[in-house]
Amino acid sequence: MRHYEIVFMVHPDQSDQVPGMIQRYSTVITQSGGQIHRIEDWGRRQLAYAINKLHKAHYVLLNVEAPQNAINELETNFRFNDAVMRNLIKRMNHAVTEESPIIKMKDERREVVELTTSGSEDNQKDHHKEDLDKKTDEFSEEN
């Protein structure tokens, strides 16, 4: 069996159906004796150019090891599913199991956001304490 990387783009209005689609396509692969190495749901992303007057799409990545008949069935499913806007099936030399660069970037951004928000909360607390100290000093000076 050969290794494949499969990326498909789903119409943004059909994003709620993506988990079911992933399950359906995974079943096609596993029932034919294939193996799934990685599934990544990239979510809604901006398109580089409009496709059918749409500027966003929901992206999904699969890395699989499957026989040719399973890949042919997937291609047929993609072709007849109106929710799938585009798809790409690429043959790979080996199984890819590590996270894709897109997921790594998302994780890094999430960490940066968490660090900056926690830092800003500390700054807000410090400013709040300083304001209270000033008001307390002003009140004690008046009395």
Curated annotation (Swiss-Prot):
It comes from Hamiltonella defensa subsp. Acyrthosiphon pisum (strain 5AT). Binds together with bS18 to 16S ribosomal RNA. PROSITE patterns: RIBOSOMAL_S6 (PS01048). It comes from the Bacteria. Residues 104-113, 122-143 have a biased composition (Basic and acidic residues). GO terms for biological process: translation. This is Small ribosomal subunit protein bS6. Belongs to the bacterial ribosomal protein bS6 family. Keywords: Ribonucleoprotein, Ribosomal protein, RNA-binding, rRNA-binding. One of its GO terms (molecular function) is small ribosomal subunit rRNA binding. InterPro entries: Ribosomal_bS6, Ribosomal_bS6_CS, Ribosomal_bS6_sf, Ribosomal_S6_plastid/chlpt, Transl_elong_EF1B/ribsomal_bS6. Pfam families: Ribosomal_S6. Residues 100-143 are annotated as: Disordered. GO terms for cellular component: cytosolic small ribosomal subunit.
